[in-house]
């Protein structure tokens, strides 16, 4: 395989970095009146302004050269054609098949997967229609008013993010709840708000053996049976998203209400599959299809557009520029829409679980940085929390500022204030404020010269802080589909360049394996095992505390 450090463009970019690292965006804008127009892209309902980055035409040309040398176009083609690019698990990676709206054949091991995809999608639609229309009744013949999704990781974050983001499109009768944490308090809080006669539980676990999910599911089942009293009633109030028919049936769920997905669908890429059942229940089949349409639009743009005008590719390459050359170890997601407040967490899992890898596809140490730490908060809240560090801290931290052009509420003045802040922050991060500008400002306030000089260093902003401004014409299912697909493909491209497998997650497994051993010790079911001295003391502390 090709190793990043051996690619000619990698070295060329280091030389270019040494020559260009002192350039300031403020000067680049002054010298180039066409800069904003040139570094601007529109795809469907999304607009990307990437002009406020530490790049010029030479930077982008070399980054595109790097992408080609790393085999990005070929790897993209392999994914869309169902080749097994998840090499450590010997699996195809085909979340794009789930939103293949042309219905053209996509082959895995000689079989077209589209008939299966369409069949599950049709069954989801029929089930959602029954629940939403009120024809699906609980064990006391009442309509469903609450849906509780029990899952973890991709079985939780994707549906939660979409249902929250698209709340204005949700069914007015349905209240959506999501349980992922096994600590007990989250499930207890949800159960205290719902009624067994009118609640539908969705248990989302591919194997139906995930410890956290099954623990919560069994507790929910016990709570339900304490009220219903009849195990046959479980079938009216529980559905499953799984592939384990036997375990689902043993749980008491009617197999007719089990919705499958496949091993070529990774958890963090699965909201388009049956894992998205809560989304379809809440938004309806038509809006779910619109979400798929938006993702398909981005897929087609991604696979058919030259790298130089390819939105996910450009975002990926700009990220590589900061991570691997500037040493930018984190990236902020700042949506300026309260309904998008779950988006940073979703992208955190997508990026960090995909690209938080230390070896290349052939098992060698990567020798360079991979995934940045992804973090964030709604933009307005972030301005009053961590934007101080972004403006005047010592780190270089790229920021995605995400907003909607169309108002989401009818409250006068609110959206204008919001967008004014988005645009102002992007400008402030880029321009900063020079010492001379600070002096002039303080002098106009009548401050004496000695005091001015004391304050100048504190009120100076270096600027040159990079941002991507991502605008949706409106927040709707179609644009949300495009937005999520954009980030999926960005993550994939970065993984290609780093030479890693973006579609496994072995780092999730080790702690889970050790937890099984320790659980037996905490419950007294197994004899104490050999651990390091710290872990042994922690186990003993727990046992002593709970003997009291």
Curated annotation (Swiss-Prot):
Gene Ontology MF annotations: carbohydrate derivative binding; glucose-6-phosphate isomerase activity; monosaccharide binding
Coiled coil ranges: none
InterPro entries referenced in this protein's UniProt entry, alphabetically: G6P_Isomerase, G6P_Isomerase_C, Phosphoglucose_isomerase_CS, SIS_dom_sf, SIS_PGI_1, SIS_PGI_2
Localization: Cytoplasm
Cellular component terms (Gene Ontology): cytosol
Keywords, ordered alphabetically: Cytoplasm, Gluconeogenesis, Glycolysis, Isomerase
Pathway, per record: Carbohydrate biosynthesis; gluconeogenesis; Carbohydrate degradation; glycolysis; D-glyceraldehyde 3-phosphate and glycerone phosphate from D-glucose: step 2/4
Record Pfam families: PGI
Cysteine disulfide partners in this protein: none
A Gene Ontology biological process term: glycolytic process
Enzyme nomenclature, EC number: 5.3.1.9
Taxonomic superkingdom: Bacteria
Annotated catalytic residues: 353 (proton donor), 384, 512
General function of this protein: Catalyzes the reversible isomerization of glucose-6-phosphate to fructose-6-phosphate.
Protein's UniProt name: Glucose-6-phosphate isomerase 1
Organism annotation: Neisseria gonorrhoeae (strain ATCC 700825 / FA 1090)
């Amino acid at each position: 395989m090709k190793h990043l450090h051996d690619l000619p463009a990698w070295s060329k970019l280091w030389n270019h970095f040494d020559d260009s690292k002192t350039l300031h965006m403020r000067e680049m804008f002054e010298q180039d009146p066409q800069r904003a127009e040139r570094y601007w892209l529109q795809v469907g309902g999304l607009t990307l302004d990437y002009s406020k980055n530490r790049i010029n035409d030479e930077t982008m040309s070399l980054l595109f050269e790097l992408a080609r040398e790393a085999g990005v176009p070929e790897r993209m083609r392999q994914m869309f054609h169902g080749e097994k690019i998840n090499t450590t698990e010997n699996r195809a990676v085909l979340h794009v098949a789930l939103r293949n709206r042309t219905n053209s054949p996509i082959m895995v091991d000689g079989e077209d997967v589209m008939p299966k995809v369409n069949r599950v999608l049709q069954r989801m639609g029929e089930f959602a229609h029954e629940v939403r229309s009120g024809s699906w009744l609980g064990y006391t013949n009442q309509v469903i008013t609450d849906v509780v999704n029990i899952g973890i990781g991709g079985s939780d974050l994707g549906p939660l993010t979409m249902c929250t983001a698209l709340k204005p499109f949700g069914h007015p009768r349905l209240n959506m709840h999501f349980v992922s944490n096994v600590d007990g308090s989250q499930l207890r809080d949800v159960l205290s708000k719902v009624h067994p006669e009118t609640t539908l539980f969705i248990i989302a676990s591919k194997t139906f053996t995930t410890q956290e999910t099954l623990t919560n599911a069994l507790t929910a089942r016990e709570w339900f049976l304490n009220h219903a009293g009849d195990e046959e009633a479980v079938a009216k109030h529980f559905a499953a998203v799984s592939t384990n028919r036997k375990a689902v049936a043993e749980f008491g769920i009617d197999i007719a209400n089990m919705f499958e997905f496949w091993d070529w669908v990774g958890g963090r890429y699965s909201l388009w599959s049956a894992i998205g059942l809560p989304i379809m229940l809440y938004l309806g089949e038509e809006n779910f299809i619109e979400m798929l349409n938006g993702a398909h639009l981005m897929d087609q743009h991604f696979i058919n557009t030259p790298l130089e005008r390819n939105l996910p590719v450009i975002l990926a390459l700009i990220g590589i520029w900061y991570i691997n050359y500037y040493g930018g170890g984190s990236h902020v997601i700042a949506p300026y829409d309260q309904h998008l407040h779950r988006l940073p967490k979703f992208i955190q899992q997508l990026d960090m679980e995909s690209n938080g890898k230390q070896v290349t596809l052939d098992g060698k140490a990567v020798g360079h940085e991979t995934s940045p730490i992804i973090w964030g908060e709604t933009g307005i809240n972030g301005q009053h929390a961590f934007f101080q560090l972004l403006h005047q801290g010592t780190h270089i931290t790229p920021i995605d500022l995400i907003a909607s052009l169309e108002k989401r509420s009818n409250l006068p003045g609110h959206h204008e204030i919001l967008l004014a802040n988005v645009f102002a922050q992007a400008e402030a991060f880029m321009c900063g404020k020079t010492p001379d500008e600070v002096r002039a400002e303080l002098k106009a306030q009548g401050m004496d010269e000695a005091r001015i000089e004391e304050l100048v260093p504190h009120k100076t902003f270096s600027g040159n802080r990079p941002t991507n401004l991502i605008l949706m014409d409106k927040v709707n299912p179609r644009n949300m589909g495009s937005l999520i697909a954009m980030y999926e493909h960005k993550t994939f491209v970065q993984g290609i360049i780093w030479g890693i497998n973006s579609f496994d997650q072995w780092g999730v497994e080790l702690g889970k394996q050790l937890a099984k051993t320790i659980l037996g010790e905490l419950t007294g079911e197994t004899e104490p095992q050999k651990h390091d001295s710290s872990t042994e003391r922690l186990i003993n502390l727990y046992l002593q505390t709970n003997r009291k």
